[in-house]
Swiss-Prot record:
The record marks 101, 190 as: Binding to sialic acid. The keyword Coiled coil applies. Residues 389-409 are annotated as: Hydrophobic. A motif (KID motif) lies at residues 644-646. GO terms for biological process: permeabilization of host organelle membrane involved in viral entry into host cell; virion attachment to host cell. Residues 510-776 are annotated as: Spike foot. The record marks 231-232, 241-242, 247-248 as: Cleavage. In group A rotaviruses, VP4 defines the P serotype. Some rotavirus strains are neuraminidase-sensitive and require sialic acid to attach to the cell surface. Some rotavirus strains are integrin-dependent. Some rotavirus strains depend on ganglioside for their entry into the host cell. Hsp70 also seems to be involved in the entry of some strains. This is Outer capsid protein VP4. A motif (DGE motif) lies at residues 308-310. GO terms for cellular component: host cell endoplasmic reticulum-Golgi intermediate compartment; host cell plasma membrane; host cell rough endoplasmic reticulum; host cytoskeleton; membrane; viral outer capsid. Signal peptide: none annotated. Residues 248-479 are annotated as: Spike body and stalk (antigen domain).
Amino acid sequence: MASLIYRQLLTNSYTVNLSDEIQEIGSTKTQNTTINPGPFAQTGYAPVNWGPGETNDSTTIEPVLDGPYQPTSFNPPVGYWMLLSPTTAGVIVEGTNNTDRWLATILIEPNVTSQQRTYTIFGVQEQITVENTSQTQWRFVDVSKTTQNGSYSQYGPLLSTPKLYAVMKYGGRIHTYSGQTPNATTGYYSATNYDSVNMTTFCDFYIIPRSEESKCTEYINNGLPPIQNTRNIVPLALSARNVISLKAQSNEDIVVSKTSLWKEMQYNRDITIRFKFANSIVKSGGLGYKWSEISFKPANYQYTYMRDGEEVTAHTTCSVNGMNDFSFNGGSLPTDFVISRYEVIKENSYVYIDYWDDSQAFRNMVYVRSLAANLNSVTCTGGDYNFALPVGQWPYMTGGAVSLHSAGVTLSTQFTDFVSLNSLRFRFRLAVEEPSFAIMRTRVSGLYGLPAANPNNGREYYEIAGRFSLISLVPSNDNYQTPIANSVTVRQDLERQLGELREEFNALSQEIAMSQLIDLALLPLDMFSMFSGIKSTIDAAKSIATNVMKKFKRSSLASSVSILTDSLSDAASSVSRGSSIRSVGSSVSAWTDVSTQITDVSSSVSSISTQTSTISRRLRLKEMATQTEGMNFDDISAAVLKTKIDKSVQISPTTLPDIVTEASEKFIPNRAYRVINNDEVFEAGTDGRFFAYRVDTFEEIPFDVQKFADLVTDSPVISAIIDFKTLKNLNDNYGIGKQQAFNLLRSDPRVLREFINQNNPIIRNRIEQLIMQCRL
């Protein structure tokens, strides 16, 4: 059987220890070498004055005032004050437990007569009457309601000169401040599930532990302490005082400071960012009515543009984060239109654009400070994508739009096919725009965001104009270059290769012929035949096998075998020590791991689904230990892996160990196993689903967890290649005899091949589903 490859890897993986020891000895023999670098040596650090360094101890000191943090939405920890520091009037914070408390705080500027204003609270426009008769102090007002559709009431105003406010979750209550500074005091609101209250802030805030509540009260009444600023004193010649200060221009290089070896250069640049989205559309196997995935993926774009009369060559990489997964299911029939998953970016998503150009600013970008950028916004609108069905009108996805707004800039590294580039990463927050998107000829409509189906809408690129400024530490002599701190390493390059290889492997699932797959699954694949398709020399075959085993030794499957071996060893010890039947039953539970849960059902906190799922996770190892004549999931997994290795054009000796290990862990994640007891069958899956039924009628019977656990220990475990639902569907539509049913229950490969050769749609659809689960 094809799963022989996994057994060989598990059996022989210990032999790589010798290879590890040889490498370790070789490395230690070459480490004790002393080199005198002379008075000048290249280091990986900027020139600094070295002090004594840090002195570490075991004391952890919690800061009194932690921050400031930018506006965000999160669940604050219990027992910590959130000190809010707003700059403008309006809603500054809102929070709810989504049950019986909706609370928001509004800041009102001084000298406001009673008037009605419109505020957006929890995404809804609310009309609230506010006033502030104070001529100098700002007024904080809490507005609260106890039902989602109720009206807001005002509580606990705080008149504040420092313009600070604080909120804390503690003791089943939400604590705030009220009164008038400098004599403000704390108050509270009761709330159920107070620890799950999510807070959304619309201003900068600080975090103060409850143990320092007196400090928080001091800040509320008197204001924050002055932030300590570092001041550098630089001696200047008298003649330097006559230098006229000039305003920085759009594109210029300014020498900020200079020593004999290093100088600080300020680079100001106008930039034009062009980018595009890329996507991956994967169609499921079968009759052509189903799509498994429509997703975003990073996109590189290279272009040129003019800046101050100079042609600039630029390179961008666009990637997205925080995607929203949507799906559409038109029905359960093989001819029903289905999209298992399609990604949409919305207001909770981010777009990252890494930018590099060939100007002087990026030549020595290693040590950088004072990085800032101003960029315009851009709107991205989705286009149409047709789902080409074999028969009938084609559904198509259309519309969708988001606008990108600058949210910060950091340093990054772009990895191209040939070189790594130290770049600037511009982060953009998103806002949804009109139009909404829909899947025409279905009932999906009026959804907002930008789907991955056609995010560029026929455009070659989107464009953003702006400027950035940074100060970089570079050598004083322009002919020298600093070392690239984030250059391509072997591992980073390997990760890029693995990413491309995973995409190729997943796309190859549609090219596998099922009849050939069954034949291949029956072959005893060993390491030589499995890796024979790799383009490599015979001399490298041993090193390939060694590297695969070395990687496989650290896989979750190998770890499970090791844990199970320890469990069986402990079980054997307990059998030898105990003489009662119960001690023997408990010791054998290394296979099931739920005997203690089943012993007393009344005290068990786990459901049947949880228990069967727990047992099922061990059944793969049980099946490996007790081979049967039937085909199992690992046979199909290994056959698909072999087919994809032979078809792949990107597989190499360096990527093979990772691919084989990932395949053993990730191929066919949803598995079901069965045990047969006379005419009764017990079947349980790793997803928690379980069935018990009779062979002759496929009539379901009550599922006895204790009996199932006993049978798992004493009987052969069989992969449910054709699961119960497929068997019942086959019997209802075609009718199968008792002997045929037994053969399918035992996963007899001869019977499976007959059904596939007869083009039975139910069996073919089941095998196709298993093939499509072979994804990395």
